[in-house]
A protein has these predicted regions:
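Short hydrophobic/aromatic patch on the recognition helix
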Residues: 59-70
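Hydrophobic/aromatic-rich alpha-helical bundle segments in the mid-to-C-terminal region
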Residues: 4, 126-129, 148-154, 158, ...
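Short secondary-structure transition hinges
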Residues: 114-165
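Basic, helix-initiating cap at the start of DNA-binding domains
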Residues: 1-45, 49-61, 75
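Amphipathic, non-transmembrane alpha-helical scaffold segments
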Residues: 27, 31, 35, 81, ...
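Alpha-helical DNA-contacting segments of helix-turn-helix folds
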Residues: 70, 77-84
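Hydrophobic alpha-helical connector segments
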Residues: 79, 93-131, 183, 187-190, ...
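Helix-turn-helix/winged-helix DNA-binding modules
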Residues: 44-47, 68, 178
Length: 229
């Protein structure tokens, strides 16, 4: 009898754990649906137009469900920024340390970025008639209004600067990038170029990202690498 009764608490704990896991899964599903709905509406209508009711209707949930996960409209915008920004950066910088030697890490990252612009995958630039996921000027307007949104955008930019600086330093160590330039300065310059290119693109000014990238790479290359290219 003692053995039989001892199994009851174990079964109860297992059942409670399964129920908790199911509830957590449901919460994650709801949150993901709300974020994806906001992303779709921001892409279709801009950052300012979609209401919370519209986001909830698109996701198939109530305002009550929204407030379980987000306190304000700013919060869901930040969640969208996290999802889009972190996913994009992971695609550009993933597995760079695992590449073979030869000082090609920066080149590969630049190529991935240029390819993403050409394919329309970069969320802040229009390509070939396909509008950007988010208009850069709307994002900057949101940053001007909201310290929370501004801080998250700054974080993503600084994360990018750090990643690029790491690639520059690795390539310098392998003799592919000039050693007389500071990696963080180069990375900051690269991000300033990207943000400037976003503005030019938003204004409808023509430019060739691949040519810009090639020019920057030549400026950074050692004399030996330039002679070979």
């Amino acid at each position: 009898m003692a053995r039989k009764s001892a199994t009851k608490p174990v079964k109860a704990r297992a059942k409670n754990a399964r129920q908790a896991e199911t509830r957590d899964d449901a919460k994650q599903h709801t949150r993901a649906a709300l974020v994806n709905a906001a992303l779709e509406l921001f892409a279709e209508q801009g950052l300012d137009t979609p209401s919370l009711d519209a986001i909830c209707d698109r996701a198939g949930f109530t305002r009550g469900a929204f407030y379980v996960h987000f306190k304000t409209r700013e919060d869901i915008l930040v969640a969208v920024m996290d999802q889009v920004g972190e996913s994009f950066l992971a695609g550009v910088f993933a597995q760079m340390p695992d590449l073979a030697g030869g000082g090609r890490r920066l080149h590969h990252a630049v190529k991935r970025f240029v390819d993403s612009v050409a394919s329309g995958a970069y969320p802040l630039m229009a390509t070939g008639g396909k509008g950007p996921l988010v208009r850069p000027h709307q994002l900057l307007d949101a940053c001007a209004r909201s310290p929370v949104v501004r801080e998250r955008y700054r974080d993503l930019v600084q994360l990018s600067v750090g990643a690029v600086a790491g690639l520059v330093k690795s390539d310098q160590d392998e003799g592919a990038v000039r050693g007389d330039v500071d990696p963080e300065t180069v990375a900051t310059m690269a991000l300033a170029l990207v943000i400037g290119a976003q503005t030019m693109n938003d204004l409808g000014l023509a430019m060739d990202p691949a040519r810009l990238a090639s020019g920057i790479e030549r400026l950074l290359a050692t004399s030996e690498k330039r002679e070979k290219s």
